[in-house]
């Protein structure tokens, strides 16, 4: 069952419709409700390798839906510590729970100050109004 539209206050957002949950020098990354809704049902997740590096504003993987193949754009730079195997095995998990079980990767941030460039939920909602 698809998730209802929501944008949790505790997350930081990127204008490319990604989110970050920051805990110390680590961050969990995923795509927003808006992104999964626009894509439709996800059928494949091409994840980065654990130990690889992701860069802010650059692609770190792909998701394929019944509508399109889309790059995943990282909101932060860092080393991939963990890939959500549940999403690799069942990509539709992102549609069902984009902020919970549908997270994509966990990273150790290499440039913690980048988080200051991310958007609050209020700022992200303004991006959505212009979308």
Task: Go through each PLM region and give its residues.
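Acidic, low-complexity mobile loops and tails
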Residues: 1-59, 92, 96-131
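Residue-level recognition of beta-strand microenvironments
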Residues: 20-22, 66, 83-86
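Short glycine-rich, polar/acidic loop-and-turn segments at beta strand-coil junctions
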Residues: 33-35, 65-67, 76
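Charged, well-structured alpha/beta interaction segments
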Residues: 55-71
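ATP/adenylate-binding site constellation spanning eukaryotic-like Ser/Thr protein kinases
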Residues: 74-77, 121
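Charged, amphipathic alpha-helical coiled-coil/dimerization segments
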Residues: 77, 81-82, 88-89, 95
């Amino acid at each position: 069952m698809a998730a209802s539209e929501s944008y949790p206050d505790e997350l930081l957002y990127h204008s490319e419709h990604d989110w970050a949950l920051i805990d110390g020098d680590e961050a969990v990354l995923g795509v927003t409700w808006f992104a999964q809704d626009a894509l439709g049902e996800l059928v494949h997740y091409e994840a980065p390798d654990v130990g690889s590096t992701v860069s802010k504003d650059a692609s770190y993987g792909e998701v394929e839906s019944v509508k399109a193949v889309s790059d995943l754009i990282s909101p932060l730079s860092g080393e991939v510590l963990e890939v959500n195997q549940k999403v690799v095995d069942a990509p539709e998990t992102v549609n069902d729970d984009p902020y919970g079980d549908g997270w994509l990767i966990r990273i150790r941030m290499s440039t913690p100050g980048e988080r200051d460039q991310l958007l609050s939920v209020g700022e992200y909602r303004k991006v959505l109004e212009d979308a």
